[in-house]
Amino acid sequence: VRRIDAFLDQPERTIPPARREAARGNVEFAHVTFGYGERHVLKDFSMTVKQGEQVTLVGRTGAGKSTVFKLLLGLYQPEAGTVTIGGVKVGDITDRERRTCIGCVEQHFSRVPGTVLEQITLGDPQITGEMARAAAALAGIDAAIRALPEGYDTVCTEGIFSQGEWQLLSIARAAAADPA
């Protein structure tokens, strides 16, 4: 959670509008190496995901699946190689634009302080209440949210949802951003 909070607290980087539009298209990992201390989990890793293609990464614990997503989200920087979206290095894409390109559902939901609505929107003013409700309906969590005392305005606490419902909320969060 601390790493996600640190990511959300980072100042927004600015890039020219022409670069923003370039940040659509294929996702490419080209000869990426990354490790935690002396332990490399990715060594000369290369992969291309075509725009619109859906990919599931599977593997043993510690194989690097989560690391791949953290590199793609810009939470980590590779030691070697490049990570690009539409030919633009991930580090050159603003955080907001990157979130419109990538939808990611993590294994464990990272709750932020605030209401159920804020769990879905992450405070992004471009995601309207209507968009959040549509995403919740798509994920199958809308009825459970509406059944809460204050619906989408209910303040989130740990026991408000079951583990499965938190996972559905995570899917709604990813869908609300309407990634490319």
Regions found by a protein language model. Give the residues of each.
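ABC-type nucleotide-binding domain
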Residues: 14, 21-180
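Cytosolic ends of transmembrane helices, especially the final helix of ABC transmembrane type-1 domains
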Residues: 1-8
